[in-house]
Amino acid sequence: MTLRIAITPGEPAGIGPDLLLKLAQQTWDAQLVAIADANMLKQRAKHLGLSIKLIEFDQHAAATPAPAGSLYLHQVDVAEPVELGVLNDANGQYVLDTLRIASEKNMDGTFAAVVTGPVHKGIINKAGISFSGHTEYFAQQSNTADVVMMLATQGLRVALVTTHIPLAYVSRAITEDRLIKVASILNHDLQTKFGIEKPRILVCGLNPHAGEDGHLGREEIDTIIPTLEILNNQGMNLIGPLPADTLFQDKYLNEADAVLAMYHDQGLPVLKYKGFGNSVNITLGLPFIRTSVDHGTALDLAGKGTADVGSFELAIREAIKLAQEKAQNQ
């Protein structure tokens, strides 16, 4: 059975369309369907010197992979013509429309997964649309109360307790309820999506030296340690809280299936240093599979043909792999 994978290229003025067009030059063992504007893709392909044949997507037809140099397309119109590297808030709604369609078509079973290209949160908000990120948007669209953002590269998976919030708000956001929900989703999806029977998860402390017995902060003593005890008593295998400045060593990571970091810039700098351009963003807890790139829109590289396809390619391959495993287990 050929699986259908939805792809949203992201911000039209950035490198997302470039990367998708490059990757469409090869064959895939799934039907890749771009949810995007045809004219925008054709103009970008011409600018890059790439040949592309766009095939109108018919969800009622049998799913077949596109030949190299071709791409199935679900049309969504941009509001205004796209200028390379120049943000235009008039096209903010276009970006959200591509995400909404991807979400709806994954929810109704048309697609087996969605792969998202990089978006520019600022320009979407400038258009008057509240948007904090893909993870939160897909959770809202699918009526999912709690989701977890996890990035993965070779030998390292990092999930986050908090995501796109100011650093000043992190401490108050780390509650027993939040920790239980995030750790439970992470543990469950490592078992069901990645086939890890009993995941071993390393948990970062919030404060320097994991609080150093309360001398550098009490969040570990008051919240994190008691919550980990509750979860471990339920059968999970959570180790911590551990000092984040020493946790990310091979001698610890080689024995772990994932790291649970308290906030965005605690866990992700290490992962991106280890595998930037070769890592993938995976949203856990959603009723459908969603993967994404590990980088931004790179407006300065749009249309130049020099942007690295590594992370986008990995995101597509990971989505196909997870979708195949899900199909086999159903």
UniProtKB/Swiss-Prot annotation:
Reaction catalyzed: 4-(phosphooxy)-L-threonine + NAD(+) = 3-amino-2-oxopropyl phosphate + CO2 + NADH
Residues annotated to bind a divalent metal cation: H164, H209, H264
InterPro entries hit by this protein: PdxA, PdxA_fam
Subcellular location: Cytoplasm
Amino acids binding substrate: H134, T135, K272, N281, R290
GO biological process: pyridoxal phosphate biosynthetic process; pyridoxine biosynthetic process
Any GO molecular function: magnesium ion binding
The EC number(s) this enzyme carries: 1.1.1.262
UniProt keyword terms in alphabetical order: Cobalt, Cytoplasm, Magnesium, Metal-binding, NAD, NADP, Oxidoreductase, Pyridoxine biosynthesis, Zinc
Record family assignment: Belongs to the PdxA family.
Function in brief: Catalyzes the NAD(P)-dependent oxidation of 4-(phosphooxy)-L-threonine (HTP) into 2-amino-3-oxo-4-(phosphooxy)butyric acid which spontaneously decarboxylates to form 3-amino-2-oxopropyl phosphate (AHAP).
The protein, known as: 4-hydroxythreonine-4-phosphate dehydrogenase
